[in-house]
Amino acid sequence: NIFKLHNEVCIFKFMDKFYVRELQIVNERVFLRSFNKKYADIMISNLRDLKCEGRVKKCYYVKEFSRKIQ
């Protein structure tokens, strides 16, 4: 169930593209939150198009970016 991944950083496949983003659920709307301010968050309109391919084990904040991902 995709709702169990709320606030988790994962590798998501959406519309045949892969993203490393944080899953956010706000007012029953699902978003893939970007860590880089240059990119917009992605609003998910159809949950069938979204698939979690894996979880990110470790990430931390650094000054240059909002989070460092390993």
State each model region's role.
Residues 1-70:
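Acidic/glycine-rich C-terminal interaction modules and beta/coil loop segments
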